[in-house]
Structure formats: structure tokens, C-alpha cells
UniProtKB/Swiss-Prot annotation:
HAMAP family: Ribosomal_bS6. This is Small ribosomal subunit protein bS6. GO terms for biological process: translation. It comes from the Bacteria. Pfam families: Ribosomal_S6. InterPro entries: Ribosomal_bS6 (IPR000529), Ribosomal_bS6_CS (IPR020815), Ribosomal_bS6_sf (IPR035980), Ribosomal_S6_plastid/chlpt (IPR020814), Transl_elong_EF1B/ribsomal_bS6 (IPR014717). Binds together with bS18 to 16S ribosomal RNA. One of its GO terms (molecular function) is small ribosomal subunit rRNA binding. Keywords: Ribonucleoprotein, Ribosomal protein, RNA-binding, rRNA-binding. The gene is rpsF. Belongs to the bacterial ribosomal protein bS6 family. GO terms for cellular component: cytoplasm; ribonucleoprotein complex; ribosome.
Length: 145
């Protein structure tokens, strides 16, 4: 069963109770989901203005869902609601970092790259040490001082 995470930003100029009501309305769309958690992250400043708004209420949904139609419905409703400034829906099991950690072919490739990086780093350090020793062994002329 795919695990999803949704970040929701609701307009910060409305009252907190209305923002919570918007989040709860959207939560009701996901009623077929299991292990549904709604975390309120509070009122925060936005990194840049969105629709001339500089603050927003952040909400985080975590849940498991088998029905992709409910995800599409959630997306459709958030686009229609004027109070919702932004939303981001992430399927955590399709996350490429997760796949890279579990795919054996990618694990072997990353180990090879790490070993190659280590060898190159050792060679560079050896060359730098050799140059430093040569510099220390050269005689100093009195005219150089």
C-alpha cells in the first residue's frame, strides 16, 4: 500500500479556525485512507509572496492509500479552494532516494564510486605530501631571504 505525504499551505490572513476547517474538509476527502495523521505546523512566513500573501498556515498529512482516485479528488478540490495557497503531494515509495537505497544495482554503483573517490583522494594527498617534502628539502639561499 503506497504511503503518501501532503504538505498544505492555507492563507494566513484568515482566522485560524477557518484554516483548520479547510484542512479538516480536505481530510474528509481522504476518508478511505488508513493511518491518516494531520499535523498542524502553525502560522509561518512564506519564503516568497504567493497571491500577494506573505503568511500561511502549514498542515502535513501522512497516510497510506490504495485508491488513486481519492488523491486526484484531493488535488482537484485544493485547486478549487481559494483559501489553499499551495499543496504538494508526495508518494514516499516512489521517492528516488528510497529506490536508490533499496535497488541492488544502484547500491553497487554507489560503492564503486565511493571506492574510486577514496583512491583518487589518497593519490592527491600523496602528491601533495611529496611536493611538501621536496619544498622542505631545498636549500635556502641567503639572497632569497
Amino acid at each position: 500500500m503506497p504511503k503518501y505525504e501532503i504538505m498544505l499551505v492555507v492563507d494566513g490572513s484568515i482566522e485560524e479556525s477557518k484554516a483548520t476547517a479547510v484542512a479538516n474538509d480536505l481530510k474528509s476527502i481522504l476518508k478511505k485512507s488508513t493511518d491518516l495523521k494531520l499535523e498542524k505546523m502553525g502560522l509561518k512566513d512564506l519564503a516568497y509572496p504567493i497571491n500577494k500573501k506573505s503568511r500561511g498556515y502549514y498542515y502535513l498529512f501522512n497516510f497510506y492509500n490504495e485508491d488513486p482516485a481519492s488523491i486526484q479528488e484531493f488535488r482537484r478540490v485544493t485547486l478549487l479552494k481559494k483559501e489553499v495557497l499551495r499543496h504538494l503531494i508526495i508518494n514516499l515509495e516512489k521517492d528516488y532516494g528510497y529506490k536508490a537505497k533499496t535497488n541492488p544495482k544502484k547500491i553497487v554503483r554507489s560503492q564503486f564510486r565511493a571506492e574510486r573517490y577514496k583512491r583518487i583522494k589518497e593519490q592527491v594527498l600523496a602528491e601533495q605530501e611529496k611536493i611538501r617534502k621536496e619544498r622542505d628539502n631545498t636549500p635556502v639561499k641567503l639572497t632569497d631571504v
